[in-house]
Each structure stands twice: as C-alpha cells, then as structure tokens.
Amino acid sequence: MKPRNSSPVTDAVTITCQLRRYEVNTVIFSAIIEEIRASLGLDDYQVGITFVGSRAIRTLNHQFRGYDKVTDVLSFPQIEWPKPVPMSKKPNIARRAARRSARIASRATVPLLLGDIVISIPQAAINAANIGQTLERELCFLVVHGFLHLCGYDHIAPKDEKLMLKVQREVMRNLGEDSRRPIWRNCVKATSGRRKRA
C-alpha cells in the first residue's frame, strides 16, 4: 500500500489517503480531529488517520482481527486505557475525558501516540447510502468512532455500547451534527482516479 498523499497536518495529527479516486481535505479533517481531541481531552496525544480502499482494509481486518471481510473502520490503540465508566445523567464528557487522559499523560515525558485509525472510504460510501447520510458525515462519524475505540470504548456488551453511543452522539453534536453547516462539509471529494500527466 503506497500512500497517494500524506500530510503531517500538525505535530500531533497525520492524515494519509491511499486512494486515487478520492481526495480528502486535510484542513477540514485536521479541524475535525482537533475538535474530537478537545472534546475527549486528548490534546497531548498524537494520532494517525489513514484512508484506504476495500482490499486494504479487508487485509488489515484479516491480519489483525482474524475476520476475512471488509469493514468500515479499524483502530490500533497504542495505550491501554482504564475501562470507561458510565456517566451521570448530566454528562460532561470533556471534563471526565480530560481527567482520564491527564492521568496517563502525566506519566509521559514526550507526546504520547494515541494510535492509528484506518477508514475504508468505499465502505463508508456504502454505509452512507444505506442510512441516507452524506459520505462526509459518515467519514466524520467513523473518525469519532475510531477515536473512541482508541480510548478504550467498545460496543460488544449492551451496556458498553450504550455508553459508547452516548459519548459518540455528544462528540458529533460538538462537530455540528445539529447545525446547518457541520464541520465536515466538503471534507472529501471524488476524483476521476486517473494519474495526471506531466
């Protein structure tokens, strides 16, 4: 898998797209990622986001999880987090997450690598079509979902899924889910997929 374009957007964020037929707007994705990091109290953590095709994510899913099938998002955490706990009726995710991440960050002398998120744009497009959403919104949702997995959230057990969905909804609201101009507008566009001649 050779990167089509890679951009170390900041010292803490790297965005790579390995597909010719899609162009990701690294400025918009950087803003999305910075808002997610702020929402979850992860300002001191580095993260990498890679956008791939169906074949690449299927290979990774088989290699690392034992599932020989295409999926939409994979997360590769580099930190073992304490298990997330349910929030009170009036959640303040940012405050709770900041305390949680500060405990881990306080032990480090250099910025910590939170992990890597790999997203299949073709699978995200299928998901978006199936649920009547835009590709842009679905990609943003998958970045949030991937971040939560990096932070130890999961959705296997019903109570864990309920907690993860609650946090996911709040972060999506912080990204403009309920506004007319969500942050993810124009974060990706389809291209012809052909190489430009010199």
List PLM regions with ranges.
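An acidic/histidine-cluster motif and surrounding catalytic segment
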Residues: 1-140, 150-198
